[in-house]
Amino acid sequence: MKTVATDIQGGDAARQALESCISKGGVALFPSDGIYGLACDPLNEKAIARIHEIKGRDDGKPSAVMYLSPLAMRDLIRDLGQRVSEAFARLLPGPVTLIVPNPRHRYPLACREDPSRLGVRVIAGPLAGVRYPLFQTSANLSAEPASSSFAGIVPEVRGAVDLAIDGGRLTGLPSTVVDLTELDENGVWTVLREGGMSRGDLVAALGR
């Protein structure tokens, strides 16, 4: 396992290491904005299966796809309606997972049972600029709490990855999950999980 910190060379070493790991089909441990996560290529079935094995998790549970570069999500944006596109512009990057319509059934391994819906994350920070989208989930054993510090990640998880990126201590808040699948058609949005983005910020961006 290779370990690299985000504070080395302004994050360049961490970004390059993450791109290399993902492109080779590896699994990476990385700092999100609130908690540590596990990541791999969202089209690599073997790598995704490894993540589920590391976590001891049911592989039928959906996961979000994370983007660290606007260019990486340009094809996805073309499929979005006007109101969802506006929501992206107002809320991302940020501590929020947006569930959006997925008419082309992109990333079916992340969507699992319902490929018509896709969870999307975009975060800022030292890893911003990584060219590849990431299949991502929290870096913890299933049903155990996620960690906001590199040192707090259990050895069973940290020792099972190909790359570990130390980003120091994070906020400890998971992303707020918001369903936008009915926003364009009915003007409706729903919070599925409270987290790092407040309801007030959501109302300001999306309306009531």
Model feature map: region roles:
Residues M1-R208:
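Active-site-adjacent structural elements in enzyme catalytic cores
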